[in-house]
């Protein structure tokens, strides 16, 4: 009986890691997952901008009411400025004006901190517009404050979120 000799051992170590096919399959799977997740992530950003616009509108309404209450409590004239938390707020018809010295100060809105753009239209009535940066259409993702033209008539606050 003859003995069989085992095949010689290779001096080359066994290769480790992924094969090219495995790597391509993983990349394809990650690409499919990214394609599915991206629209959902974009939708979340749009919802967040719309929620931010609604929150700013609520803040503006509350600030206008608070400014009027402050003026009434202090016995100020309807067109006199009031001081709120150390800042002077210009008033017209017992409510903040629609400019940088009125409702923007009263609501403590900052273009830098709130990631918005601010624009104003001279009146009467004065109008302040707050647009959400990053919106697909700025004209339809904004809050507009229109100061009152008539004494003791509240200002109007309009919210547009269609283009957020």
Which residues are covered by each model-predicted region?
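Short, intrinsically disordered N-terminal pre-domain segments
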Residues: 3-4, 40, 162-164
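Periplasmic/extracellular, small/polar-rich flexible segments of pilin-like filament-forming proteins
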Residues: 69-164
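Structural signature of extracellular appendage/secretion-system components
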Residues: 30, 42-43, 54, 72
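Alpha-helical hydrophobic helix detector
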Residues: 24-39
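N-terminal leader/signal peptides at the extreme start of proteins
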Residues: 1-16
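C-terminal region of N-terminal signal peptides and the immediate post-cleavage residues
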Residues: 38, 43-50
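Membrane-proximal N-terminal amphipathic helix
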Residues: 48-75
């Amino acid at each position: 009986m003859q003995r069989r000799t085992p095949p010689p051992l290779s001096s080359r170590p066994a290769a480790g890691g992924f094969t090219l096919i495995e790597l391509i399959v993983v990349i394809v799977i990650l690409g499919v997952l990214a394609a599915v997740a991206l629209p959902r992530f974009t939708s979340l950003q749009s919802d967040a901008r719309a929620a931010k616009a609604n929150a700013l509108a609520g803040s503006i309404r509350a600030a206008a009411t608070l400014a009027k209450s402050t003026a009434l409590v202090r016995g100020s004239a309807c067109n006199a400025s009031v001081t709120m938390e150390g800042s002077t707020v210009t008033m017209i018809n017992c409510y903040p004006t629609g400019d940088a010295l009125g409702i923007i100060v009263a609501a403590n809105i900052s273009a830098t901190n709130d990631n918005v753009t601010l624009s104003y239209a001279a009146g009467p009535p004065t109008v302040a517009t707050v647009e959400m940066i990053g919106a697909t259409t700025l004209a339809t993702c904004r809050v507009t404050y229109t100061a009152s033209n008539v004494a003791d008539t509240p200002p109007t606050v309009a919210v547009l979120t269609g283009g957020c």
